[in-house]
């Protein structure tokens, strides 16, 4: 009984909580300009439009250099877990992004994002995503 609180801390979080945590880590990596943290969340077969994982990494470096000061917020995050496998999921959210070289943003946009995730070795990785502007 005395070990119960310690053992509880070692449990794997439920899939939905783990997915929300993975999305939050992605958000934090994007805002912080941490290419490594973002790349750690991308599956080996990741796709975004015509970009594969490697090309997405190069694009991130360019964006981070162009906008050294940036903010990223994921809002209205909804997780839809595959009820059969519990290893695949769709996560949708609104993304608000803005950035620039100084304190005031030079550019800002908002997107509706639909992303597919897969559990690999205990970690949730992003397989692909679709984003469209909220003004579209």
Task: Kindly label every feature range from the protein language model.
Residues 1-2:
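N-terminal export leaders
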Residues 6-34, 40:
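Short, low-complexity N-terminal intrinsically disordered segments enriched in polar/charged residues
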Residues 12-19, 31, 49-53, 70, ...:
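Solvent-exposed, acidic/flexible segments
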Residues 25-27, 43-49, 102-103:
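Second-shell loop/turn segments in exported
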Residues 35, 68-69, 122:
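Generic structural signal for secondary-structure transition and capping sites
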Residues 39-78, 84, 93:
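Short solvent-exposed beta->alpha transition segments
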Residues 82-136:
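Exposed beta-sheet edge and beta->alpha loop/turn motif
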């Amino acid at each position: 009984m005395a070990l119960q609180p310690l053992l509880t801390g070692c449990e794997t979080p439920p899939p939905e909580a783990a997915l929300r945590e993975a999305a939050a880590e992605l958000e934090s990596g994007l805002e912080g300009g941490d290419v490594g943290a973002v790349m750690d969340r991308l599956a080996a077969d990741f796709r975004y439009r015509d970009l594969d994982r490697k090309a997405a990494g190069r694009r991130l470096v360019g964006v981070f250099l162009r906008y050294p000061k940036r903010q990223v917020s994921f809002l209205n995050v909804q997780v839809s877990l595959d009820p059969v496998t519990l290893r695949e999921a769709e996560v949708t959210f609104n993304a608000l992004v803005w950035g620039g070289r100084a304190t005031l943003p030079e550019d800002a946009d908002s997107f509706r994002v639909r992303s597919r995730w897969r559990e690999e070795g205990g970690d949730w990785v992003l397989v692909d995503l679709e984003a469209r502007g909220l003004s579209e």
